[in-house]
Structures are given as C-alpha cells and as structure tokens.
From Swiss-Prot:
<dbReference type="GO" id="GO:0042542">
    <property type="term" value="P:response to hydrogen peroxide"/>
</dbReference>
<dbReference type="InterPro" id="IPR013698">
    <property type="entry name" value="Squalene_epoxidase"/>
</dbReference>
<dbReference type="InterPro" id="IPR040125">
    <property type="entry name" value="Squalene_monox"/>
</dbReference>
<keyword id="KW-0256">Endoplasmic reticulum</keyword>
<feature type="transmembrane region" description="Helical">
    <location>
        <begin position="472"/>
        <end position="492"/>
    </location>
</feature>
<feature type="binding site">
    <location>
        <position position="183"/>
    </location>
    <ligand>
        <name>FAD</name>
    </ligand>
</feature>
<feature type="site" description="Important for enzyme activity">
    <location>
        <position position="146"/>
    </location>
</feature>
<dbReference type="GO" id="GO:0005789">
    <property type="term" value="C:endoplasmic reticulum membrane"/>
</dbReference>
<comment type="function">
    <text>Component of the triterpene saponins (e.g. ginsenosides or panaxosides) and phytosterols biosynthetic pathways. Catalyzes the first oxygenation step in sterol biosynthesis and is suggested to be one of the rate-limiting enzymes in this pathway.</text>
</comment>
<keyword id="KW-0812">Transmembrane</keyword>
<dbReference type="InterPro" id="IPR036188">
    <property type="entry name" value="FAD/NAD-bd_sf"/>
</dbReference>
<feature type="binding site">
    <location>
        <position position="361"/>
    </location>
    <ligand>
        <name>FAD</name>
    </ligand>
</feature>
<keyword id="KW-0285">Flavoprotein</keyword>
<protein>
    <recommendedName>
        <fullName>Squalene monooxygenase SE1</fullName>
        <ecNumber>1.14.14.17</ecNumber>
    </recommendedName>
</protein>
<keyword id="KW-0274">FAD</keyword>
<dbReference type="GO" id="GO:0050660">
    <property type="term" value="F:flavin adenine dinucleotide binding"/>
</dbReference>
<feature type="binding site">
    <location>
        <position position="112"/>
    </location>
    <ligand>
        <name>FAD</name>
    </ligand>
</feature>
Length: 539
C-alpha cells in the first residue's frame, strides 16, 4: 500500500510538472512582452516627469511634437538662417561648447549684389570670433579706404590703420564665397548640425518660444526644440513680426553690374561717385571683377525686359562715371547681366520674447551705401557670445530674456553709429533741387577733402574703427557749420544768412529723425539705461 501510494504521489507530481511546463511554454513569451511593455511605460513616465520638473520644456503630445529625433535636451540653440550672421553665430556658439542646430532655406552658394564689402571694424570682429581665415582662398581684395568723386573733382580717404596689425584692412569679395567658407567652418564642428529646410513658424507655449516648425528639402514637416532660438533669416524674414515691430523703409534700389578685367583709378579703394540723382559705387570683388552699384531713388527701377533700364544706365549714369571706367561700364550694360534689389532700412525695435532672439538683417537694417551691415552683425555676435558665456543652462527662458535685454543697449555704440551714418550720408550725397541741400552736399565733399581730422574722423566712423555716436554727431554738424561759414564769408548778405539757416535746419531734419529711431538715451547715454547693468543669472 505504501508502494502504491508512493507511486500515485509520484505520478501526480509528474503530471503537475508536465502541466506547469506546458503553461510556461504557452505563456512565457507573453510574460516577457508584458514585462518589457511595463518597463518601457515606467521609463517613459520617468523621463517625462524629469523633463517637466527640471527644464519646463515641452509641448502637448496631441500636437505631435515629440519624436525620438527632437526630444528636448539634444540642442542648446536653434539658429534660423545660415547667411553671414547665422553661420558666424553657429561657429561662435559651437566653439564655446553649445549644441547648435542650424536650419537654412538654401545651403547652395548664394549670389547676391550686396554684403560684398567688409569694413576694417568688421574684420577685427571676424578676428575676435576666430573666423578671419574665411576671407582666404576666395580671391578677396583688400580695401584701404575710399575715393570720392563729384563734379570733376576727387579726393581720397584712407582708413586710419596705423595702430593695427598689417593684416587689418577692409575686404571685398563675392558674398556667396564668403558665406560658404563660414558655413563649412561651422559645419566642421561636431556639435553643429547644419540642415537645409524652411522654417515656417516658431513654436510657442505660454508666451515662450520653445523651438521651430520647418519643412525639410524633401517636404517633410518637422519640429525642432531648444531653450534658445535665434532668428537670422535675413532682410526678407517671415518670422520677425512676432519678435519686433518692423518699420521697413525702401528709400532706393541698387542696380548691380560687374565690370571685368580693368583696375580702379585708386587701387584697393572703394569709389563713390556723387552723381545725379544719387550715388554710384565701384569696388573690386575679385582680382578680375569690379562690382558697380547704381543707386536709383524710389521703390522701382526702370524695366529691364524692354531695355528701359539699359537705356537709363547709358544715357543718365554712364556720362557721370569716371572716364577710366566708362568703356567697361558700357560693355557691362551691353552684356545684359543686370541685377536689381531694393535697399531696405529698419531700426531695431525688439519685443523681448523668452526663448527667442533676432539678429542680422532680420533685426536691423540700414542703407547699404556705407557697407556697414556685416560689421554690425559681427559686432552683435561678439556681444551675444560674451553674454552667454557665463551661462551653463539656458532653460530658464524668462530669466534669460530679462538678462539679454542688456544686449539691446550694449550694441548701440557700434550699431547706432553705423546706422545713423548710413542714413545721413545717403541723404546728403543724393542730388537735390533744394539750394540748401546742394550747399550741404558741397560742404560735405569739401570738408572731407580738407584732410586731417576732417577726413580721418568720418572715415574712422564709417569703417567701424571708432564707433562713437557723439563723434558722429559733432562731425555731422561741423560739416553744416563749415557750409554756413562758407556762405557768410566774406560778405554775409541777408540772402546768404537765410540760406545758412536753412542749411542748419535741413541738417537737423536729416539726422534727428534717425537718432530718434535709434533711441536717444540708448545711443548717447547707455549707462543710464537700467538694462545696461544686467548681471548673468545665478543657477
């Protein structure tokens, strides 16, 4: 009986083990899947919680923004646009260790007729950013000053470069070649992602910019996120309206030509012809090419397709061109490769927005007559770099926004000097039927021809080597007073006195509206603006 009972127990145990093994075989795979699924849910919940608590960065899942490629934390700064400002900024921030995602509409070499002359002050900023080698290997030409022509007279204004290294000078080049060099240098850094795509909008949540939505070159719609988005998408920016109050003016248009295989009368100098109705510019952009820019007042130029523009260039402009350049100018017109573009000006009027910043032509423009745009942009980038350097974490967008308000005041000495000079010089250099304006134009040419401080002071301002608004103000009214003095000496008749008074009033009418748009306090007394003293936030 004991033997029978033992056998029964053994059989029962054996049956139980067989049943258990069968159950394990049937459900083992399901248990594994259940365990993995639960683990992944727990991990995802933990990550979301950490992200919400530590960075306050993200958007609702219902919007479709979270994908494995753009979970917050993989990028520190998004840069929209990779022109001069965007590519220089990308290299600068990445060189400081930031993870940078650049989204540019077109990464092929651009072909523009402006952004081709970098002033010495801008070249110094290029050195400061470690980008000076980007003017090498593109056939860039050194520029040492300007030659000024008016009514058969000419004078030469040289940059005051005596105190600088021999390499410091202006540079003129093909804009596209220069930009490509900077893009390549930025993209060579491992923490820069350079992508071709069109940014369609900023992603905002609770008043803060969290990133951008964009279309890739294949048409795929994606989103990218970062604690700071910097918009540098140029003069045609479609994003600036939410970040500033854009008051764009178009005082004139440029007509661009290229003269080939000829030298300028004054080697290594830009040439400005004070023509009627407005200035003409010449400068070398390669060893064999001279860029000619003809300013046409107003928002429209004569029609190209019916030959009206070519006729205008031959009959109105060509007779005012220096005789050494006349034949090459006519040949360039006949060749037919005529380009046009509107000249825009827009004072900086930002809406400080947490998580976002505007830079470059998207933020601030001035008439390109003085070639100061790249100098302003590079100077702004140096400031942004210095302001961001002490910060390890950019996620506190409100605090960062308040801190970066200092940028708008700190940039004023350079930006307002170059902006004001560009706007004022353009108005003075244009021909006018008004007798007082004519006297101001003649006085300006003769004042610059005096030499010494009368030429070195203004050219130091224009070059970005001496960005002092008070110096600009004093030289501008010195020109006006010089013009009045010429009218009153030797015989101050009532007619001449009245003309002198009109000259002063006209000069005031030119410069004071520009100063007002730049901001009187920020321009001349930045130290009394509270934002000037903003300290880096302590984390």
């Amino acid at each position: 009986m004991n033997s029978s009972s033992s056998t029964t127990t053994t059989d029962t145990l054996h049956s139980f083990m067989e049943a258990s093994a069968l159950l394990i075989d049937q459900y083992f795979l399901g248990w594994i899947f259940a365990f993995l699924f639960g683990f992944l849910l727990l991990l995802n919940f933990k990550r979301k919680r950490e992200k919400n608590n530590s960075t306050e960065f993200g958007t609702d899942d219902s919007n479709g923004y979270y994908t494995p490629e753009n979970i917050a934390g993989s990028t520190d700064v998004i840069i929209v646009g990779a022109g001069v400002a965007g590519s220089a900024l990308a290299y600068t921030l990445a060189n400081d260790g930031r993870r940078v995602h650049v989204i540019e509409r077109d990464l092929t070499e651009q072909d523009r007729i402006v952004g081709e002359l970098l002033q010495p002050g801008g070249y110094l900023k290029l050195i400061e950013l470690g980008l000076e080698d980007c003017v090498n290997e593109i056939d860039a030409q050194r520029v040492f000053g300007y030659a000024l022509y008016m009514d058969g007279k000419n004078t030469r204004l040289s940059y005051p470069l005596e105190k600088f290294h021999s390499d410091v000078a202006g540079r003129s080049f093909h804009n596209g070649r220069f930009v490509q060099r900077m893009r390549e240098k930025a993209a060579s850094l491992p923490n820069v992602r350079m992508e071709q795509g069109t940014v369609t909008s900023l992603v905002e949540k609770k008043g803060s910019v969290k990133g951008v939505q964009y279309k890739t070159k294949d048409g795929q719609e994606l989103s990218a996120f970062a604690p700071l988005t910097i918009v540098c998408d140029g003069c045609f920016s479609n994003l600036r309206r939410s970040l500033c109050n854009p008051k764009v003016e178009v005082p004139s248009c440029f007509v661009g030509l290229i003269l080939e295989n000829i030298d300028l009368p004054h080697i290594n100098h830009g040439h400005v012809i004070l023509a009627d109705p407005s200035p003409i510019l010449f400068y070398k952009i390669s060893s064999t090419e001279i860029r000619c820019l003809v300013d046409v007042p107003g928002q429209k130029v004569p029609c190209i397709s019916n030959g009206e523009l070519a006729n205008y260039l031959k009959t109105v402009v060509a007779p005012q061109v220096p005789k050494q350049l006349y034949n090459s100018f006519i040949a360039a017109v006949d060749k037919g490769n005529i380009r046009t573009m509107p000249n825009r000006s827009m004072p900086a009027d930002p809406h400080p927005t947490p998580g976002a910043l505007l830079l470059g032509d998207a933020f601030n423009m001035r008439h390109p007559l003085t070639g100061g745009g790249m100098t302003v942009a590079l100077s702004d980038i140096v400031l942004i770099r210095d302001l961001l350097r002490p910060l390890r974490d950019l996620h506190d967008s409100s605090t960062l926004c308040k801190y970066l308000e200092s940028f708008y005041t700190l940039r004023k000495p350079v930006a307002s000097t170059i902006n004001t000079l560009a706007g004022a010089l353009y108005k003075v250099f244009c021909a006018s039927p008004d007798k007082a304006r004519q006297e101001m134009r003649n006085a300006c040419f003769d004042y610059l021809s005096l030499g010494g401080i009368c030429s070195q002071g203004p050219i130091a301002l224009l070059s970005g080597l001496n960005p002092r608004p008070i110096s600009l103000f004093l030289h501008f009214f010195a020109v006006a007073i010089y013009g009045v003095g010429r009218l009153l000496i030797p015989f101050p008749s009532p007619k001449r006195m009245w003309l002198g008074a009109r000259l002063i009033l006209g000069a005031s009418g030119i410069i004071f509206p520009i100063i007002k748009s730049e901001g009187l306090r920020q321009m001349f007394f930045p130290a009394i603006v509270p934002a000037y003293y903003r300290a880096p936030p302590i984390h």
